């Protein structure tokens, strides 16, 4: 975040890369990686399929976990809180940045996250199950892409 450079993490422990990738600015604390301070990779590259292509992978699978912005009737016409405004802003920008990058993936898995936001950590078990269901449903598309 200090330089604006994209920093692919392709070595070390997966949990460290995942922790950095979930460091949404203003919501979660950035991660120090060497001399760099890292935030959510979605800021610059929310669908790093281009890196997978450069590594020569046979199949690039993207997972779209962006929540659907559906304000309730009572929310319409009301100014949202500052945190909600920030999160929605990141989601909107993320969608615009992700759209062309998603086309580089062979298969896109989209779990039904509904209106759950990343900061709602208490809903993790529900989201994990939705991810599992979406992954199972994507097996035919994955097999087709692999020509299996």
Predicted feature residues:
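Patatin-like phospholipase
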Residues: 1-148
């Amino acid at each position: 975040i200090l330089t604006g450079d994209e920093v692919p993490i392709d070595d070390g422990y997966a949990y460290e890369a995942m922790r950095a990738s979930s460091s949404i600015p203003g919501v979660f604390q950035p991660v120090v990686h060497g001399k760099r301070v890292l935030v959510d990779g979605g800021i610059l590259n929310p669908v790093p399929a281009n890196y997978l292509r450069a590594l020569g992978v046979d199949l690039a699978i993207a997972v779209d976990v962006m929540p659907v912005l559906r304000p309730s009737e009572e929310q319409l016409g009301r100014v949202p809180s500052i945190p909600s405004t920030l999160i929605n802003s990141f989601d909107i920008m993320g969608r615009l940045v992700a759209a062309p990058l998603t086309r580089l993936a062979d298969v896109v898995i989209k779990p039904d996250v509904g209106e759950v936001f990343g900061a709602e950590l208490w809903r993790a078990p529900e989201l994990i199950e939705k991810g599992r269901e979406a992954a199972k449903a994507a097996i035919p598309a994955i097999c087709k892409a692999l020509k299996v």
